[in-house]
């Protein structure tokens, strides 16, 4: 068992790169709560947390195919599933135009929609990682400046099977039609594809061996 979660990992990475970073989350009243706070204190990351007395801290099991290196993740979001717009509002006074706001899909779709809308209306750069994938109002994508699905999530989002570059390009264009300005699709060992607002480009993957 180790620390993690997309939000925590990304917030710590941003902090290590020198960015002033705030992590807004909801945890259970358990040992993992203390464990998480110990890590964030060590990394000098400010975390705005709400403690849920009825639900545990979210957990994920990661299963790796040692032949291919591909992974599968089973998530129990626990308390984080109840993250709400009120948690966003508690930090709103610190947010300003040009700041970067990143969210994912471990909270409810209603909360995801609401926080993206609020952040975009504040003039923030909004990044949406649609994982674990779930359905959300089509209108929500209008408030995403950047979306970052992986290969599976892009297929679920577009109903296009990504068998080659042409399929990836079709998927990117379909996502753009939802109102998203920029698209990054991660493709595992094949690298990534991205649309920067003008052109679609492909970035090859590098094999760094076991990590």
How would you describe each model-predicted region?
Residues 1-59:
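Substrate-binding N-lobe of the ribokinase-like
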Residues 15, 41, 120-121, 176:
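Anion (oxyanion) recognition and catalysis
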Residues 51-52, 62-100, 105:
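Conserved phosphate-binding/catalytic loop of the ribokinase/pfkB sugar-kinase fold
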Residues 100-170, 190-192:
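Conserved beta-alpha-beta core of the PfkB/ribokinase-like small-molecule kinase fold
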Residues 135-139, 165-211:
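Conserved phosphate-binding/catalytic region of the ribokinase-like
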Residues 44, 81-86, 126-133, 205:
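Short gly/ser/thr-rich secondary-structure transition/capping motifs
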Residues 12, 59-63, 72, 191-195:
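Short beta-strand scaffold segments in enzyme catalytic cores
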């Amino acid at each position: 068992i180790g620390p993690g979660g997309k939000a925590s990992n990304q917030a710590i990475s941003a902090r290590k790169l020198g960015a002033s970073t705030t992590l807004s989350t909801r945890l259970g009243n358990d040992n993992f709560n203390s464990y998480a706070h110990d890590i964030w204190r060590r990394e000098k990351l400010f975390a705005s947390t709400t403690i849920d007395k009825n639900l545990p801290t979210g957990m994920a099991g990661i299963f790796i195919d040692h032949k291919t290196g591909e992974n599968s993740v089973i998530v129990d979001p626990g308390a984080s599933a109840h993250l709400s717009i009120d948690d966003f509002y508690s930090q709103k006074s610190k947010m300003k135009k040009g700041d970067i706001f990143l969210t994912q899909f471990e909270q409810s779709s209603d909360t995801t929609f609401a926080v993206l809308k609020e952040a975009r209306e504040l003039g923030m750069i909004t990044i949406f990682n649609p994982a674990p994938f779930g359905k959300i109002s089509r209108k929500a994508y209008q408030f995403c400046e950047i979306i970052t699905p992986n290969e599976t999530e892009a297929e679920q989002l577009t109903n296009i099977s990504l068998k080659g570059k042409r399929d990836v390009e079709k998927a990117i264009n379909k996502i753009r039609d939802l109102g998203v300005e920029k698209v990054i699709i991660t493709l595992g060992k094949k690298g990534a594809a991205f649309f920067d607002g003008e052109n679609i480009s492909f970035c090859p993957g590098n094999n760094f061996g076991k990590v």
